[in-house]
Amino acid sequence: MIGRMYQDTHFNLTLLNGLSIEQLKVCVNPDDGGVLIVYLKAEGQPIFHFFLDVGIAFCECWNEYEVDEDDDDYRFDDLTEVWQLKGKHISAIFAQEVARNSEITFLLEEGEKLLLYYCPTEDKSYFIKKLKQ
């Protein structure tokens, strides 16, 4: 499971279903605040990278256990504590096409979901938000 796992408008990643979240970080463009990459670490697994580009959703895993924050051009925000995600269980991660762009949904067994999506009407293009189901 090393490398790019998905590059499509739709995918369903079942490998992490039922596992608890250890960490969720985002790489942010400091110029516009847009989310570039979501880093998800689930129990017993390496870090998974999720991102959107040109209307397509991507999922990668490079068998890394730490987020490389050496790039000073970007900001790395840890949302684990801010959104109280540590220990919450993943029930599904999937990408779907919405308005000719992909979005990635992270469903949690605790009745919450995280959504990585594209919004062309804002100053920044890519957002992540936490919602109740």
Segments (PLM) and residue ranges:
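Surface-exposed, interaction-prone regions used to assemble/regulate multi-protein complexes
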Residues: M1-Q133
